[in-house]
Amino acid sequence: MSDIITVTLPDGSQKQTARGTTIADFVRESIGPGLAKAALFARVNGQDMDLARKLDEDVKLQIFTPKSPESLELIRHDAAHVVASAVQKLFPGTQVTIGPATEEGFYYDFFREKPFTPEDLEKIEAEANAELKRDMAFVRTEISMDEAVRLFEEKGEKFKVEIVKDIAAKGAKTLTLYTHGDWVDFCLGPHAPSTGKIGIIKILSSSGAYWRGDHRNPMLQRVYGTAFFDKKQLAEYLTRIEESKKRDHRKLGKELDLFHFHPYSPGSAFWTPKGTTLYTTLSNWMRQLTQNDGYVEIKTPLMFNKGLWETSGHWGKYKENMFLVLDSESGEHDFSLKPMNCPSHHLFYGFKKHSYRDLPLRYHTQDVLHRNEAAGSLGGLTRVRQFAQDDAHIYCTEAQITDEVRRFVKLLDHVYKAVGLTYAVKLSTRPEQRLGDDSLWDRAEGGLKAALESLGLEYELAPGDGAFYGPKIDFAVSDSIGRRWQLGTMQLDYLAPERFDLTYVGEDNAEHRPVVLHRAIFGSFERFTAILIEHFAGAFPAWLAPIQAVLVTVADRQNDYARKVRDSLRAKGYRVEFDERGLSMNAKIREAQLQKVPFTLVVGDNEVSGEGVSPRRYGGEDLKTMKVTDFEALLAKEAALP
């Protein structure tokens, strides 16, 4: 074995170094001191690692610095460790549980008798930032599972002991520890070289959370926080958070009278007339788009016997997330409300024999689904128990994958652009544990790549993140204030056709397995509606607005004319109201602005005599007085489904 290994860098260049050289030393000696000083972690053959790890074989190496988008997640994980250390220093006897990084920060769950007060959170933040100034190294070690159990038992960390034993029960032989100062926790890593690499930590809030999300378990204290490389980034984030609070769909949903919730049916929305209009407009829009794109809409039952879920594999893995129904004949909970559409669509496909000439078959549905989400996880429309998806399943041949993916991405692109959402694409490829041989995965991944590249789309490659039954493409959108939301997906599935014995007759008159493509654009209607409420801050474009125009008269003598205009516009399908309340004109205009109605139509004597209206856009832009027919033409253009 040679003592020299080859390191391939992202630009394709190659460098040699001694076997056993640490990543940090390699960067400093072979690339330069500037990058070595800025480096936070590395990706080695697709696996993220600390800079202190050694290079023992030929590798592909990528270095991440504060300029890398991926680095924020790293320092937020670091910050979770630092905050946990600060809490245990300030509040002896507090036990630690878990503390992951999240999309925009991190949280850590603690067990203690008393909830944290606002004053406690201020102390925690101050101590955490003091630990950053001490610039303590993160040191990685590995110990046996027995040693890990003893370590955390000696520390009195019963929750950590429980987790370690669970990990050991799954076959793990060793556990990775990270220490900074005298505080230690276990995690997979990686971590930055030291606490000083974190610029600043901000504690945001605290709340209660049950251990492992189960109300039968102890209540924990969850501390939320975030971290950035400098104060400017933090200030921008806090400004965005304040704007987010103003746009919170739960707040706007109440102010704009769109939806309600009731404890008798947690996680299930009551849609008001205005909210129902918003919901059905999205529903009808998606229905029109899919029909125009060659989909057929189907409906399948709400409730199924467990046999379906045993065939699909969900009964053993997903049963706890289902609402189970008692079978009066067997006396057992053998039925459930469906939590997803896929298995029932596979049954539907199997009702008939199919030829290669029938494919691709594109089934679309908007059926209601139910998932037994933990009560503590429910939040407005973004996490619910009853919902509907713009769900579709495409049954096609392997040769049709690229064209079908391309077709789907074009539809998704149209939808997101129509509502002003930009998006990023991630392609997740084969995991270690997977179905099928490498040639199958080569073809599947190649088909997805070819589709994305033919459309000129940039995408992030996520090696190993695909499902065991096939690779997938995920689409994360960014809203008007820069927040990212995971929405669309396209997943290839080679397993379902096997489980459900799905076939088609090929040109050779032999039976073949189709490929199943699972895809969604909205995700759930409820969550997509929440995102749009916040994205538009409740000020929807005319085509989506529950009320597109409201008429306001200067005096009562114009009321008959206003009713005539309202009725005329309604007859043509527009959503128009006339505010007949006994308020002043200015009060009515102000109310229309508060309700974010796209057009307020002022009617006075001049408008009556001229058969016109004086439109005012939401936000205050006055348009010139125009004939009703001219306004109708304007509204027709802006109210048309995109």
From Swiss-Prot:
Catalyzes the attachment of threonine to tRNA(Thr) in a two-step reaction: L-threonine is first activated by ATP to form Thr-AMP and then transferred to the acceptor end of tRNA(Thr). Also edits incorrectly charged L-seryl-tRNA(Thr). One of its GO terms (molecular function) is threonine-tRNA ligase activity. It comes from the Bacteria. Keywords: Aminoacyl-tRNA synthetase, ATP-binding, Cytoplasm, Ligase, Metal-binding, Nucleotide-binding, Protein biosynthesis, RNA-binding, tRNA-binding, Zinc. SMART domains: tRNA_SAD. This is Threonine--tRNA ligase. Zn(2+) binds at residues 342, 393, 518. Binds 1 zinc ion per subunit. Residues 248-541 are annotated as: Catalytic. Homodimer. NCBIfam families: thrS (TIGR00418). It is found in: Cytoplasm. Belongs to the class-II aminoacyl-tRNA synthetase family. The keyword RNA-binding applies. Its cofactor is Zn(2+). SUPFAM superfamilies: Class II aaRS ABD-related, Class II aaRS and biotin synthetases, TGS-like, ThrRS/AlaRS common domain. It is an enzyme of class 6 (ligase).
